[in-house]
Amino acid sequence: MIDLRNVEKTYYSNAGDIHALKKTNLHINAGEIFGIIGLSGAGKSTLIRCINMLEVPTGGQVFVDGQELTAMNNQELRKARQNIGMIFQHFNLLASRTVYDNIAFPLEIQGISQSEIKKRVQPLLELVQLQDRGDYYPSQLSGGQKQRVGIARALASDPKVLLCDEATSALDPQTTKSILDLLKDINKRLNLTIVMITHQMEVVKEVCDRVAVIENGEIIEEGSMIDVFTDPQKPTTKDFVKSINNIELPALLQSSSISAVYTEGSKLIVRLSFIGNSAGDPIVSGMVKKFDVDINIIYGNIDRLRIYPSAPWSLRFQEAPQVSKMLCNICMNSS
């Protein structure tokens, strides 16, 4: 659905050039929720604005739904943008217009008739659960309700892609969850491709199918949400993952699946990650019974990565031949 090929963005100034994006390549599949996470100034907002050409790349190509946006003239680009909705951290609603009229606004600009606008706006009000707020003004709404209006307005043109630029950053945790639940529902109902820019790993964990990590204008890591969470490769990614695990482990434990081998005297420390159905299986007690080993659990956590249960555990063993046999058995069963 979305392809970025060697996309670059440089801001030129007398004080010095800023290379916001450097040879960025990214493929986002149709119908998935794709997260782009990075620290402030990493280039993530520049990247998402290059997707709909709010920022014109200095170099490279941008394709959306098979069309090259970077090769279009202004008229062609205006038409192509109707397939790309966008919501922002700040809701950007028109204070003098009602909820209904805010949602209708992009359709009015396109010259669509009032009867057709009504057919589109009413279902959108129901979709974002504001069917009883159509006559309200933005000043009468909560932050979460304002963002729901923003989402409905972004969907008014029936786009294939929804870009979300820090859409939950200004919301409290409970409201954030309700907005993320809404986006997941919209993704399923409409088969909508959603791109989420965020600095919050909790957001990625909750909704994303795949994720890319951006740092200093470069994509440094990319993969499925499960892979990135359970096997982070880069220091920045590890810091993001650590921020939601709320624990500092020795460096040799910062890997996934099975990593044996932080030694502590005559003992081994092993880190195991159970994903999906295995997170609920009695694996640790099974190891004790089968291999007759003493296990000390030094860290354990049960979490959820979108729809998948996740359970990272760190275990301490007395070194013994049966421990090596046990670890080999785990590796064979997980491969």
Can you annotate each of these PLM segments?
Residues 67-68, 104, 108, 115-132:
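Conserved ABC ATPase "signature" region
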